[in-house]
């Protein structure tokens, strides 16, 4: 069983949902980022979704774009991100780790080389945000060749064919987007048809569903679980804590610890 499958089975047995924070690797620096990620795991994160710093992220709202810029300004490359992942994996052998990336970033390194490096540093799954199902083949092949689980996004306006494709091709988990638009902690609305989408994904035997976009409050975690999702992903709200404490690292870690504990408590 993969780390994601093992974790979901463990959570199911305890009747808990998953809380998964997202942060950008090397934000604001390599060392601070390592301590941030350790804080997330030590305070109850069930899995990690991590981004590589990139100058042109399509789905990211201003908060995560700023995180990308901080890491890039600090001079961090994709190889630094891989080294950081390696450090995280050696400290936490069990935690499921997924990457959320743009295709250009993978392309720059070459598909095969990128997924091989992911395997070497202990990444479990990769979600390429801007690859439609129709263009998935090369990415899925490269991922599977190196034992990496490909993850796909189910958008709120998905038709039956898309739902079926996402369910069939996703491994590890399924990313259900709460609403159209870019990521944001401010816009906490979600599409009215999410419960139907969850039902349809499950009818097609999709892997466990994690709902993301606009998850900033414990009540929204509860809501995602009530809709039938296996858990919730929180990116902008997590990164915002880093952004507002750039000049006080200890305060940043303390606030992140409290945030993760509160969000995790909502899954029980």
From Swiss-Prot:
Residues annotated as the enzyme's active site: 49 (proton acceptor), 60 (proton acceptor)
Key words, A-Z: Amino-acid biosynthesis, Aromatic amino acid biosynthesis, Lyase, Tryptophan biosynthesis
Subunit structure: Tetramer of two alpha and two beta chains.
Upper taxonomic lineage: Bacteria, Pseudomonadati, Pseudomonadota, Gammaproteobacteria, Pasteurellales
A GO MF label: tryptophan synthase activity
Descriptive protein name: Tryptophan synthase alpha chain
GO CC aspect terms: cytosol
UniProt similarity note: Belongs to the TrpA family.
Keyword set includes Lyase: yes
Organism, as annotated: Haemophilus influenzae (strain 86-028NP)
EC number: 4.2.1.20
Matching Pfam families: Trp_syntA
Catalysis performed (reactions): (1S,2R)-1-C-(indol-3-yl)glycerol 3-phosphate + L-serine = D-glyceraldehyde 3-phosphate + L-tryptophan + H2O
């Amino acid at each position: 069983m993969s780390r994601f499958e093992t974790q979901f089975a463990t959570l199911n047995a305890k009747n808990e949902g998953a809380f998964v924070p997202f942060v950008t690797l090397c934000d604001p620096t390599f060392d601070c980022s390592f301590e941030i990620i350790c804080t997330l795991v030590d305070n109850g994160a069930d899995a990690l979704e991590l981004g590589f710093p990139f100058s042109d992220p399509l789905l990211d709202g201003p908060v995560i774009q700023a995180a990308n810029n901080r890491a890039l300004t600090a001079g961090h490359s994709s190889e630094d991100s891989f080294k950081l992942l390696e450090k995280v994996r050696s400290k936490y052998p069990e935690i499921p780790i997924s990457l959320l990336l743009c295709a250009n970033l993978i392309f720059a390194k070459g598909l095969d080389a990128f997924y091989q490096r992911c395997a070497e540093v202990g990444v479990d799954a990769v979600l390429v945000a801007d690859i439609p199902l129709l263009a998935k083949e090369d990415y899925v092949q490269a991922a599977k060749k190196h034992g990496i689980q490909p993850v796909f996004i189910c958008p709120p306006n998905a038709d039956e064919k898309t739902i079926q494709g996402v369910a069939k091709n996703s491994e590890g988990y399924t990313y259900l987007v709460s609403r159209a638009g870019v990521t944001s902690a401010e816009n906490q609305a979600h599409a009215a048809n999410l419960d139907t989408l969850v039902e349809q994904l499950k009818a097609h035997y999709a892997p466990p569903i994690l709902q993301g976009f606009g998850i900033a409050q414990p009540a929204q975690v509860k809501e995602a679980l009530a809709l039938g999702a296996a858990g919730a992903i929180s990116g902008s709200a997590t990164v915002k804590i880093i952004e507002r404490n750039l000049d006080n690292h200890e305060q940043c870690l303390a606030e992140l610890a409290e945030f993760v504990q509160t969000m995790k408590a909502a899954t029980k």
